[in-house]
């Protein structure tokens, strides 16, 4: 339970609020990632939700600070310091932003025991639960003596993950980070990374009546796609991770040629390669280039993202992980194989 703010734009009162009530208030406050809306759109940005939680945090006795990420966008940091000298830090890390939705989806509604609305799962539900838990610990007697608990409500998860990257760049470290992504209420200790790639084939244009005078870049790319979706995907399936299964490759975009009566001189595909713990973007590039050479295929390969998402894995034998498993009655950690 925590101080409530019953209407958007109002100030916290001394009433009490359950996690479900808090989630309703968070859903009512749109926080759509600005990347998905025109500049100045009223639903764009995380500030309204962050300001609301900051006011609640102060009322709950938490230390409130912000870490600027971009103009008008900042991570909200709510800290509960220990009563003694801090020996470890636990980081709670949900995100504030959502993708866009129809206006009615920002009005929460309860159906068959479930609360629906934009961000209810991803991740305003965990944000509400984590906030309420932290507020309860702040009121508890005794409070943690050696553990600092920080709720880092992050911006920009849905686009470029600038919020989490800014947290790391600012030197933040934790002994355990609990990410607010939905997991089906399972303790998850591993998830895949993502590397986006561009492959281009070049040919020579010619008239469609004399294709033998040209070199068809689309045909060349067709062989590359067949290789990636065939032999390469099979090789990835042969080396699965125990929690995540195999790495994957998906050709999600293709473009080439100008019109049917011209032999195309250029073709491009864009590929999503999901990586496993231990794999790196540079290693993926080397692997695909070697595969192309082996099959005598020519294609220009470049990364699409300057900062790919790395795979993550936490030691399943870490004492804090074991405590989580015990509380949940879960025999072993799971992996987010759906990402």
Describe the role of every protein-language-model region.
Residues 16-118, 139-145:
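Acidic/His- and Gly-rich active-site-bordering loop/insert found
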Residues 111-123, 329-333:
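Short pre-catalytic strand/loop immediately N-terminal to key active-site residues, enriched for Gly-Thr
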Residues 208-254, 262-263, 277-301:
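Acidic-enriched catalytic cores of C-N bond-cleaving enzymes acting on peptides and small amides
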């Amino acid at each position: 339970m925590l101080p409530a703010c019953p209407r958007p734009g109002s100030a916290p009162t001394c009433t009490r609020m359950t996690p479900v009530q808090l989630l309703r208030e968070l859903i009512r406050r749109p926080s759509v990632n600005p990347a998905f809306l025109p500049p100045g759109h009223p639903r764009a940005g995380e500030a309204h939700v962050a300001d609301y939680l900051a006011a609640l945090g102060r009322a709950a006795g938490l230390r409130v600070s912000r870490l600027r990420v971009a103009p008008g966008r900042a991570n909200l940091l709510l800290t509960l310091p220990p009563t003694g000298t801090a020996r470890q830090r636990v980081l709670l890390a949900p995100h504030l932003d959502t993708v866009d939705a129809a206006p009615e989806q920002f009005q929460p509604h309860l159906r068959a025991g479930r609360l629906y609305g934009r961000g209810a799962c991803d991740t305003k539900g965990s944000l509400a639960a984590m906030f309420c838990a932290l507020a309860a610990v702040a009121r508890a007697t005794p409070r943690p003596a050696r553990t600092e608990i920080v709720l880092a409500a992050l911006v920009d998860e849905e686009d470029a993950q600038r919020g989490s990257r800014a947290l790391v760049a600012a030197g933040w470290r934790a002994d355990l980070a609990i990410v607010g992504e939905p997991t089906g209420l399972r303790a998850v200790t591993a998830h895949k990374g993502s590397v986006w790639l561009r492959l281009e084939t070049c040919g020579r244009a010619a008239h469609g009546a004399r294709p033998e005078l040209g070199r068809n870049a689309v045909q060349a790319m067709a062989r590359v796609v067949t290789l990636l979706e065939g032999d390469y995907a099979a090789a990835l399936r042969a080396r699965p991770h125990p929690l995540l299964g195999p790495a994957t490759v998906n050709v999600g975009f293709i473009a080439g040629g100008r019109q049917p009566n011209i032999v195309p001189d250029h073709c491009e595909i864009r590929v999503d390669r999901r990586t496993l713990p231990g794999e790196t973007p540079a290693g993926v590039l080397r692997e695909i280039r070697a595969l192309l050479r082996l099959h005598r295929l020519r294609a220009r390969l470049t990364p699409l993202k300057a900062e790919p998402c790395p795979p993550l894995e936490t030691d399943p034998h870490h004492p804090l992980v074991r405590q989580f498993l015990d509380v949940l009655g879960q025999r072993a950690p799971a992996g987010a194989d759906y990402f």
